């Protein structure tokens, strides 16, 4: 199965010794057999479901652990990275000393030494000029399966001379007993060294740490080259018109970009360069809680052989109870992108975007289902990144809580948010793109805006009917709202209509406006940021 001549000897360069066997770039059938091996115990063992997909559990780590993320502070990163301990604004880029890095690296390499290992060589980025060649090393078959699904799978020819730009060593079974003395958050760690170009994982089994780890790396490298790096999904119409959907986990990026009328470019991570929009990934990582064939047919039918389910409840007959959130609200499935029929082929990239959609899940019930943004409002709401953290996507979050996440992805930003905003705005201006704010969250009824209405809103954005619609201005937020749209309940377009009285909306709106204003203060120490204050609520 080995295409190139990778040997256990090669792994000694990473500090991994006495490897029993290398399973190099296994095919899906091999992984299927490995995951169902009855000799496996605990979280290593997969369960076969009636669709042919394998289901695995990730233990207490059913979401990312942002408090356990660290980056080595050295000459490479000292003056470029957006550090957690410098300046204004909250982020997860906690500095790590070289000494502690060496200790953590020793723990992981010791864990992987003397073992039977799975190696996956894959690409991150569909543009051959800027993609990263990544080597993933793990002792767990399903973790190899996960990255095979999620990253771009090289051809046999591309594997012949594959040279990794970045190494990910997943030591999920090891923890750091010296964390207290080292001033770390816990015994678990997700650590990066951008000089050595290595990511280490210890203690957490959550597959998303590998996916989002590489996203953080791309978020460091690309904007420094003038390329937009975006936490968004993207699709393209028959006429070549590209739409991108920004939003945090659970706001609808995957669901809304998976549209039978349009071809999917990707569901979560993209770049935007001189040629257009391109996917970082080769797969999708969709939430499955309360999944149904009726509401989300493409995702539902993508769950078949080679898909990998996480933390779902499998019944005795092999069927999956997608409504069961007893393990987590953040149940997931990863699958190769070709499990979706309507995708861009052969490479997941297209032209420049004409529609930029910011998805927010407003827990206050204040924002309208859709509004058309001015250029300054686009920058303001991109930097604000308002949404609600939805249950389960991070450990310890069980109820929707309002949050501000710069660029709709602060957890993954490696540079200061204004750098991403500047690059995005330049790309949008060059392409003549228009931005919209879409609330997929709640309104005054206390219920979530229906996916039917949201899909009709997206259709109106894509086909241009929203741009042609008459609008009125929502007070306090100064947002332009259409008076009516095809297929959308007109009553809900003005959020004030969903309350018992206008005063009830006003009260909540004032509270939310105050949060926006307080959050944006961290950007007002620059002339560019101060100039955007008037684009927000007042």
Swiss-Prot record:
Pfam family, one: PEPCK_ATP
Binding positions for Mn(2+) per the UniProt entry: 212, 231, 268
Domain of life of the native organism: Bacteria
Binding locations of ATP: 212, 231, 247-255, 296, 332, 448-449, 454
Binding site for substrate: 64, 206, 212, 332
GO biological process: gluconeogenesis
Major site of localization recorded for this protein: cytoplasm
Cofactor, free-text remark: Binds 1 Mn(2+) ion per subunit.
EC number(s) on file: 4.1.1.49
Keyword field contains Manganese: yes
InterPro entries xref list: PEP_carboxykinase_ATP, PEP_carboxykinase_C, PEP_carboxykinase_N, PEPCK_ATP_CS
GO CC annotation terms, alphabetical: cytosol
Alphabetical keyword list: ATP-binding, Cytoplasm, Decarboxylase, Gluconeogenesis, Lyase, Manganese, Metal-binding, Nucleotide-binding
Cofactors that this protein relies on: Mn(2+)
Annotated PROSITE patterns: PEPCK_ATP
Disulfide pairings: none
Molecular function as annotated in GO: ATP binding; metal ion binding; phosphoenolpyruvate carboxykinase (ATP) activity
Pathway, per record: Carbohydrate biosynthesis; gluconeogenesis
Catalysis performed (reactions): oxaloacetate + ATP = phosphoenolpyruvate + ADP + CO2
Alphabetical list of CDD domains matching this protein: PEPCK_ATP
Protein location: Cytoplasm
Free-text function comment from the UniProt entry: Involved in the gluconeogenesis. Catalyzes the conversion of oxaloacetate (OAA) to phosphoenolpyruvate (PEP) through direct phosphoryl transfer between the nucleoside triphosphate and OAA.
Sequence similarity: Belongs to the phosphoenolpyruvate carboxykinase (ATP) family.
Subunit-level organization: Monomer.
NCBIfam families: pckA, PRK09344.1-1, PRK09344.1-2, PRK09344.1-3
UniProt-recorded name of the protein: Phosphoenolpyruvate carboxykinase (ATP)
Organism of origin: Enterobacter sp. (strain 638)
Taxon lineage: Bacteria, Pseudomonadati, Pseudomonadota, Gammaproteobacteria, Enterobacterales
Gene name of the record: pckA
């Amino acid at each position: 199965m080995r295409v190139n001549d990778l040997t256990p000897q090669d792994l000694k360069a990473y500090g991994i010794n006495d490897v029993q066997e290398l399973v190099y770039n296994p095919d899906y059938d091999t992984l299927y057999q490995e995951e169902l091996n009855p000799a496996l115990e605990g979280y290593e063992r997969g369960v076969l479901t009636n669709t042919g997909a394998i289901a695995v559990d990730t233990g207490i780590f059913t979401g990312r652990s942002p408090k356990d993320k660290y980056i080595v502070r050295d000459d490479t990163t000292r003056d470029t990275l957006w550090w957690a301990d410098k300046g204004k604004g909250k982020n997860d880029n906690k500095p790590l000393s070289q000494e502690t890095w060496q200790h953590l690296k020793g723990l992981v390499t010791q864990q992987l030494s003397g073992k039977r290992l799975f190696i996956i060589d894959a690409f991150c980025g569909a543009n051959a000029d800027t993609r990263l060649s990544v080597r993933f090393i793990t002792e767990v078959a399903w973790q190899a399966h996960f990255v095979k699904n999620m990253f771009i799978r090289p051809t046999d020819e591309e594997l012949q001379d594959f040279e990794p730009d970045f190494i990910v060593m997943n030591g999920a079974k090891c923890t750091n007993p010296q964390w207290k003395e080292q001033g770390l958050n816990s015994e678990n760690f997700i650590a990066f060294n951008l000089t050595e170009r290595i990511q280490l994982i210890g203690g957490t089994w959550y597959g998303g740490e590998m996916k989002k780890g590489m996203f953080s790396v791309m978020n460091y490298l690309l904007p420094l080259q003038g390329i937009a790096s975006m936490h968004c999904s993207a699709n393209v119409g028959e006429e070549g018109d590209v739409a991108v959907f920004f939003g945090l986990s659970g706001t609808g990026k995957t669901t809304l970009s998976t549209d039978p009328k349009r071809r999917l470019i990707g569901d979560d991570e993209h770049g935007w360069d001189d040629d257009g929009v391109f996917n970082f990934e080769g797969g999708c990582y969709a939430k499955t809680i309360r999944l149904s064939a009726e509401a989300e047919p493409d995702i539902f039918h993508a769950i078949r052989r080679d898909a990998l389910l996480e933390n779902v409840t499998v019944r005795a007959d092999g069927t999956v109870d997608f409504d069961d959130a007893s393990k987590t609200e953040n149940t997931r499935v990863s699958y190769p992108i070709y499990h979706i029929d309507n995708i861009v082929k052969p490479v997941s990239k297209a032209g420049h975007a004409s529609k930029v959609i910011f998805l927010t899940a407003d827990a206050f019930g204040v924002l309208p289902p859709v509004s058309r943004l001015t250029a300054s409002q686009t920058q303001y709401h991109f930097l604000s990144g308002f949404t609600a953290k939805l249950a389960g996507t991070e450990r310890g979050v069980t109820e929707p809580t309002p949050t501000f996440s710069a660029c709709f992805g602060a957890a993954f930003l490696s540079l200061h948010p204004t750098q991403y905003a500047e690059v995005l705005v330049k790309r949008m201006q060059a392409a003549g793109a228009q931005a919209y704010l879409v609330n997929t969250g709640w309104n005054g009824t206390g219920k979530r805006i229906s996916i039917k209405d949201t899909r009709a809103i997206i259709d109106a954005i894509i086909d241009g009917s929203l741009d042609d619609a008459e609008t009125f201005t929502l007070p306090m937020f100064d947002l332009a709202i259409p008076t009516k749209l095809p297929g959308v309940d007109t009553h809900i377009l003005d959020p004030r209509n969903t309350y018992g009285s206008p005063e009830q909306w006003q009260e909540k709106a004032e509270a939310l406006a105050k949060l926006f204003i307080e959050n944006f203060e961290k950007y007002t120490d620059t002339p560019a940021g101060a100039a955007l204050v008037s684009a927000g609520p007042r």
